[in-house]
Design a protein with these regions (language model features):
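Exported/periplasmic ABC-transporter solute-binding proteins
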Residues: 1-256
Length: 256
């Protein structure tokens, strides 16, 4: 059997994955997620990796930047899941990493955003397997002091932690605190003012866009992962959809 692993509702990775694969069907304002009820819900990127690593018939989907060699990423339509293929547009399953905030940022939070978008910040983005989005010059901020609270996506969190670590070395007056939940919770926190900056691994929804300012800090693929022992190497988007909607239930239907 194919053991399907999915992310929770509120996960930006789930929102982007279901939309890009056609599992999510839109009819006007109505959206229907046709993921089969037999898919097991898992609440973080790391937990999906662990679950697929420990189950030789499992399939899951994660942030490409979080991929490691304990699991295998499948090609999609013959195209490998790599940052280069995301950048060129050849890899079909990709999405933005967004940060969002309400109104004007504090001096120190704005300085941190300037750092992320600088060539220094974008080097960290690409060094960690994500796709850069800005051609800005090197960071030359005033290094204001203060605290910055960042909250949201488990996909964005790993690169945000690296960015925060590097920024705090450059600006020793700043303290960046990161709380990881999911994209929707991050946007709610930003709208409610309980964090300075929210993180989302998807496009913002209309109600979020109307309340928040948004900036894309990186692009990321969504890797479809299986156990290293699985002999399947390549699926089409339609095959991925057919697994997650419950039409395809056994690997032998795919692996001939």
């Amino acid at each position: 059997d194919v053991y399907k692993r999915q992310r929770e509702e509120g996960s930006g990775t789930r929102d982007a994955f279901t939309e890009l694969t056609g599992i999510l069907v839109k009819d006007g304002d109505n959206k229907t997620d046709n993921t089969t009820a037999s898919a097991v819900t898992i609440n973080s990127t790391e937990a999906v990796i662990t679950n697929v690593k420990d189950n030789d018939a499992a399939i899951g989907y994660i942030s490409l930047g979080s991929l490691n060699d304990t699991v295998k990423a499948l090609k999609i339509g013959g195209v490998e899941a790599t940052a280069d293929n995301v950048k060129s547009g050849d890899y079909a399953v990709s999405r933005p990493f967004n940060i969002a905030y309400k109104g004007e940022l504090s001096d120190v939070a704005q300085d941190f955003v300037d750092y992320i978008m600088s060539s220094d910040g974008q080097k960290i983005v690409s060094d960690n397997g994500y796709v850069t989005v800005s051609e800005n010059a090197a960071y030359s901020g005033k290094k204001p002091s203060g605290k910055i609270s960042v909250a949201g996506s488990t996909s964005v969190s790993p690169v945000m932690e690296k960015l925060a670590e590097a920024y705090q070395k450059v600006n020793t007056n700043a303290k960046v605190e990161i709380q990881t939940s999911d994209s929707s919770a991050g946007m709610q926190s930003a709208m409610g003012g309980t964090c300075d900056i929210g993180m989302a691994s998807r496009d913002l929804k209309d109600e979020e866009k109307s309340a928040l300012k948004v900036e894309t800090i990186a692009k990321d693929g969504i890797a479809v992962i299986v156990n290293n022992a699985n002999t399947c190497d390549d699926l089409t988007l339609d095959q991925v959809k057919s697994i997650y909607t419950g039409e395809t239930t056994v690997w032998s239907d795919i692996i001939k």
